[in-house]
UniProtKB/Swiss-Prot annotation:
Family to which this protein belongs: Belongs to the universal ribosomal protein uS3 family.
Name of protein: Small ribosomal subunit protein uS3
Organism: Finegoldia magna (strain ATCC 29328 / DSM 20472 / WAL 2508) (Peptostreptococcus magnus)
Quaternary organization: Part of the 30S ribosomal subunit. Forms a tight complex with proteins S10 and S14.
UniProt-listed Pfam families: KH_2, Ribosomal_S3_C
Gene name of the encoded protein: rpsC
Amino acid sequence: MGQKVNPKGLRVGVIKDWDSRWFADKKDFGDYLVEDHKIRELIKKESFSAGISSVSIERASNKIKVTINTAKPGMVIGRQGAGVEELKNKLEKLTGKKLIINVEEIKFQDLDAQLVAENIASQLERRISFRRAMKQTMQRSMRAGALGIKTMVSGRLGGADMARSEGYSEGTIPLQTLRAAIDYGFAEADTTYGKLGVKVWLYKGEMLPGMTEEDLPVYKNKKNDKNKKRRNNNRKGKSQAAKN
């Protein structure tokens, strides 16, 4: 049987960039790798409800630049920047190095596989039926402009004695096409029957050479829709003013 490889790892260096961008000697490589893992774990733990999708880490001499991609930047930053300052102090204490933290907002949450997976997991923890949780979330992503989505939930579904996996898919998911921009997310739900694993594959279109993720048709259509709404609102405002 053919096993499924992580779609992000398969596309690194082709259409995706690394989440950790630094170079190290043999003696330092292991330490840096463990440090990156600890940084990500601490950020996830401290800002669990902020909807963090990914954390990018860059290193230069004795400085670390951390970029947090989140759906709720206000929760990470806190009032007058108190939250991000507290997080920075904790990370500096953990690493013993100077840190720069950037917080970037994810504008389209339904088009981020990690956030979609975490959304399904949170619904499962609230005892919502796994079929309903998957189908509703998939419909939202397809309405948001995704070209295809596949979800899978594994574990003791519905409290059954034997663990099993159940999944649904909609649209197209070309996993073997390396230029296909497929986002992958994984989350765990802690239920009274044990842990349930949630996997999400989300297809956003083909990424051709020289393109960035923002150039994908999914995001371009979203921007065009926003501009259309703005123009329509301006026209309505002008026509009402003319009538008055």
